[in-house]
Amino acid sequence: MATITKLDIIEYLSDKYHLSKQDTKNVVENFLEEIRLSLESGQDVKLSGFGNFELRDKSSRPGRNPKTGDVVPVSARRVVTFKPGQKLRARVEKTK
């Protein structure tokens, strides 16, 4: 299964909508930057028909070093999760 990169998206959108690659790159970069800024400021991001980027606080917990088996503390942190929306989930499930 191939991986699609940001450059692949820029090239696809540029070709599909007959825009310059630089203009398309600016749109994609600005879109992603808005998502980043929203998450950094503590806001969840909801993209209708696609899914939600949500912030979750994980508490500290004991972990284990896989090489030595020693118990090591894992510090508390905030993580970003993605939860696909119903439409995206349904379309992906059809492709199996």
From Swiss-Prot:
GO terms for molecular function: DNA binding; structural constituent of chromatin. SUPFAM superfamilies: IHF-like DNA-binding proteins. Gene3D superfamilies: IHF-like DNA-binding proteins. Transmembrane segments: none annotated. InterPro entries: Hist_DNA-bd, Histone-like_DNA-bd_CS, IHF-like_DNA-bd_dom_sf, IHF_alpha. GO terms for cellular component: cytosol. GO terms for biological process: DNA recombination; positive regulation of metabolic process; regulation of DNA-templated transcription; regulation of translation. Keywords: DNA recombination, DNA-binding, Transcription, Transcription regulation, Translation regulation. It comes from the Bacteria. This protein is one of the two subunits of integration host factor, a specific DNA-binding protein that functions in genetic recombination as well as in transcriptional and translational control. Heterodimer of an alpha and a beta chain. Belongs to the bacterial histone-like protein family. This is Integration host factor subunit alpha. It comes from Haemophilus influenzae (strain ATCC 51907 / DSM 11121 / KW20 / Rd). The gene is ihfA.
